[in-house]
Amino acid sequence: MTIRLLGRTEIRRLAKDIDFRPRKSFGQNFVHDANTVRRIVSASGVHRHDHVLEVGPGLGSLTLALLDRGAHVTAVEIDPLLAQQLPTTIADHSHSEINRLTVLNQDILTLMPSDLENQPTALVANLPYNVAVPALLHLLAEFPTIRSVMVMVQAEVAERLAADPGGKDYGVPSAKVRFYGNVRRYGMVSPTVFWPIPRVYSGLVRIDRYETSPWPTDADFRAQVFDLIDIAFAQRRKTSRNAFAEWAGSGNESARRLLAASIDPSRRGETLAIADFVRLLQRSGEAEEQVRVQ
């Protein structure tokens, strides 16, 4: 028995059968176009050796396509009604593939490695606007085994995640996700392929974790780098010298640390790349040591 993907009619019938009404608070919009589903899964690069962490499986459109790739899937769904229905839907539309599916009824922001029997190698997620960035950063931090990420988010969030330094959309999320890997856009998704139809376009973003990280990845180092990113964008139009003055202890010390990191103190924080923030933290420690020696 081959896997049958869900269409618009089936999705609406499923929702009716279980007396389900989409909730705005959960950002519930379900893809019903098979071509879009195949495009997302193809762009994710998922294959049969992967263990995929799927966030927000909903009624199962993407889940079926991921299983069709031969992957093992752990689907995390916050809505108890949808989590309960998902195994039945998968069983009805496939055959032995149900044996490669695990469903958890849980808030993704509380998910930890200890909750999973096997650790994921890939993440595929349909993330609502209000939790997209926190959820993504949480999963990248807590699940280092995840090597590739494909997320579908509101177009505005996609633009922010993939923005380059100095651009109008570049900000805290843009810099922080690059701590983990390379980021690129994979196009737009029309509102018409969803039920219910959202008011905005969605965007696809892929993140590939660095094969070998250019910098330390421990939690303490990451937290210090992220603090610098937060400082820089709290008043993004300030010069770096002024933005980091309180952190460094004075404007002069801020300038000295920036110069030690080969950063022009007159540059605005919004132009700094993740490598600049990392270098600033690393060189500031060296600068402090030189002051103590003197």
UniProtKB/Swiss-Prot annotation:
It is found in: Cytoplasm. GO terms for molecular function: 16S rRNA (adenine(1518)-N(6)/adenine(1519)-N(6))-dimethyltransferase activity; RNA binding. It catalyses: adenosine(1518)/adenosine(1519) in 16S rRNA + 4 S-adenosyl-L-methionine = N(6)-dimethyladenosine(1518)/N(6)-dimethyladenosine(1519) in 16S rRNA + 4 S-adenosyl-L-homocysteine + 4 H(+). Keywords: Cytoplasm, Methyltransferase, RNA-binding, rRNA processing, S-adenosyl-L-methionine, Transferase. SMART domains: rADc. GO terms for cellular component: cytosol. InterPro entries: KsgA/Erm, rRNA_Ade_diMease-like_C, rRNA_Ade_Mease_Trfase_CS, rRNA_Ade_methylase_Trfase_N, rRNA_adenine_dimethylase, SAM-dependent_MTases_sf. Gene3D superfamilies: Ribosomal RNA adenine dimethylase-like, domain 2 (1.10.8.100), Vaccinia Virus protein VP39 (3.40.50.150). S-adenosyl-L-methionine binds at N29, V31, G56, E77, D107, N126. Its EC number is 2.1.1.182. SUPFAM superfamilies: S-adenosyl-L-methionine-dependent methyltransferases. Its main location: cytoplasm. It is an enzyme of class 2 (transferase). PANTHER family: DIMETHYLADENOSINE TRANSFERASE, DIMETHYLADENOSINE TRANSFERASE-RELATED. Specifically dimethylates two adjacent adenosines (A1518 and A1519) in the loop of a conserved hairpin near the 3'-end of 16S rRNA in the 30S particle. May play a critical role in biogenesis of 30S subunits. Belongs to the class I-like SAM-binding methyltransferase superfamily. rRNA adenine N(6)-methyltransferase family. RsmA subfamily. This is Ribosomal RNA small subunit methyltransferase A. The gene is rsmA.
